[in-house]
Structure formats: structure tokens, C-alpha cells
Amino acid sequence: MDKSKRTFRKSKRSFRRRLPPIGSGDRIDYRNMSLISRFISEQGKILSRRVNRLTLKQQRLITIAIKQARILSSLPFLNNEKQFERTESTPRTTGTRARKKKIGLLLN
């Protein structure tokens, strides 16, 4: 058999299949906070389906459960810890330029 006519075969690499993040016994519900908190970022955002490795149906159910938990205030809308940190105040500049313009207009 000629080399050009031979089919090119790649060696198949074995890969370990990841376990699904949601087991068959887990209920996707707004009260199941331990499950819901796995699919929320540190900022409080809902993680995407690619990051979560969920099916479309599971992602939809998780999203609905997170939104219900937020509305019932068992989960915050935002996780802003920076909100309470005090930042250094910047010195305010006085409007000397604006005053000079006003004075110049009054003199003319």
C-alpha cells in the first residue's frame, strides 16, 4: 500500500471523565443554599454554564433558584465587601479658574 493512500490515524488518548457537579439526589431548590452557593462567584454573580459544567436544563433551574433566593433575601444580590472599606479622600480643588473667568466677565 502506498504511503499517500494510507489513512492517517491519530492515537486516541484516554481521558478521565469529570463527575457532574450536581448529583442525582441533589434537589435544585432555592432553599438548598449549599448547592446554590457552589454556582455563584465571589462577587455574587451567577457563573456561566461552561464554568459550572452543567446541562442547559440544570443551568436554567440553578439560575431560577438563585433568583428566587435573592428575592426572598436568603442570598444577597451583590457580595460587596468593599462597600464598607474606607477609601482615602482626595483633596478637592477650589475653582480658582472659574472665579477668574467670572471676575473677568464682570470687569468687561
UniProtKB/Swiss-Prot annotation:
It comes from Illicium oligandrum (Star anise). PANTHER family: 30S RIBOSOMAL PROTEIN S18 (PTHR13479), SMALL RIBOSOMAL SUBUNIT PROTEIN BS18M (PTHR13479:SF40). It is found in: Plastid, Chloroplast. PROSITE patterns: RIBOSOMAL_S18. Residues 1-19, 97-108 have a biased composition (Basic residues). Residues 1-23, 83-108 are annotated as: Disordered. It comes from the Eukaryota. Pfam families: Ribosomal_S18 (PF01084). GO terms for cellular component: chloroplast; mitochondrial small ribosomal subunit. This is Small ribosomal subunit protein bS18c. Part of the 30S ribosomal subunit. Transmembrane segments: none annotated. One of its GO terms (molecular function) is small ribosomal subunit rRNA binding.
